[in-house]
Amino acid sequence: MNKAFVKSELFLIKNDKLLAPVIKKNGHLTFSNKKTDPFNELIEIVISQFISTKAAKAIKQNILSRFKEDNFKIKSFEKLSISQIKNLGLSNNKAKSISDIIAWSDLKPSKNYIFELSRDEREKELLSIFGIGQWSVDMFEMFCVRNANIFSSGDAALRQAMLELGMVKKEANLSSYDNYSKKWNPYKTQACLHLWHMIES
C-alpha cells in the first residue's frame, strides 16, 4: 500500500473494490482545502464547458496571455463587450455568460460573499447567472469552495470512467451514477479526481 495515500483515499480503497485498483495505479492525488477566487473559478468553469480538458487549457492560456495575467480578473473583462469577449476564442453563449458573471459580481458586497452562503443558497445564486447550470455549480463547489463531498453525474468524463470500470450499466440513467457515488461519501470529490486522472492518463 502506498504510504502517501491520505485518509480519504484509504477509505475509498477499502469501500470500493472497483475504484481501488485505479487509486493504487494513480498514486496519491492532492485535493487542497484552500478556497480559490470565485471570479477566476467561474470564468475557468465557463471556458471548460462542453470541451475537452486539453482544449479548455489552451483557450485559458491564450486569453491570460493576451491579458498578461496569471489569473482571470474582473478588470480584464469589465470594459469588453460580449462581441469582444467572444473574439477571445469563445462561443457567443460563453461570452454572454462571462458578461453576466461580471454583472453578478459587481452587485456583491465582497468576493468572499459567496462563501458565506449555505450550499443551497450558493447554488441558487449561481444558477441565476446566464450559462451556469448544475455541472458548473458542482465544479464551483469542488474547486472554489473546496467541498470534499461532491459528485457530478452531469460530467461526461466521470460517466465514461464509471462505465469503463463496470460501476454502472451502459443504459444507466444519471440517478444510477448518483446512487453508485453514495459509497464514496464523504469523499466523493477525491473519487472524482481519481476517475478524471484515469481518463486523462
Language-model regions, residue ranges each:
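C-terminal accessory module of base-excision DNA glycosylases/AP lyases that mediates lesion recognition
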Residues: 1-30, 95-96, 100, 118-119, ...
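Alpha-helical ds-nucleic-acid-binding substructure associated with the helix-hairpin-helix region
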Residues: 18-20, 25, 52, 56-128, ...
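Residue-level detector of well-ordered alpha-helical segments, enriched
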Residues: 38, 42-43, 55-59, 94-97, ...
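Short, solvent-exposed helix-loop connector elements
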Residues: 30-32, 124
